[in-house]
A protein has these predicted regions:
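Fe-S ferredoxin-like electron-transfer domains
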Residues: 1-124, 130, 136-149
Length: 149
């Protein structure tokens, strides 16, 4: 059996999939902490995706109830639902902090068992941040607070 992975049809399917992912992403790459190291940005550039032909599926002002005092920050508008954070937390760290919430187009990655992140047993190991391909999970930036001190 021969499987062709670089035919025009396969390349077009890849491009369409990336465009669909980008339609649910906030696409503010210039101001993102992952700019230059974002895997979605790299794949988009490699495939030549310069604009998204689909209407953005982000709800205006979509926010999550996330504390700004916790060292881990989550941006649901940058999350592409790859579930790497869930896998690394479950299989490597054995903490099960993250879980899938909702279904269909409302699917999101959230703290398991409908807990707040402060109530979860997160060890702050940073593995979920390291494995996040976009800026969906990142460490809290206290640069301005340090300069103000």
């Amino acid at each position: 059996m021969v499987i062709h992975t670089n035919t025009p049809r396969v390349r077009e399917a890849r491009r369409t999939n990336v465009e669909l992912i980008l339609s649910q992403h906030d696409n503010k790459c210039a101001t993102c902490v992952r700019s230059g190291s974002c895997q979605l940005q790299k794949i988009s550039n490699d495939l030549g995706v310069l604009s998204v032909p689909y209407k953005s599926d982000l709800a205006a002002g979509k926010k999550s109830f996330w504390t700004t005092t916790f060292p881990l920050y989550r941006d649901i508008n940058k999350c592409i639902k790859c579930m790497r954070c869930i896998q690394i937390c479950d299989k490597v760290q054995s903490l099960s902090i993250w879980d899938v919430s909702g279904s269909g187009s409302r699917t999101t990655i959230d703290v398991s068992e409908n807990r707040f992140i402060k109530e979860a047993d997160c060890s702050l190991c940073g593995q979920c941040i390291t494995h996040c391909p976009t800026g969906g999970l990142r460490e809290r930036d206290d640069t301005q607070r340090a300069f103000a001190a």
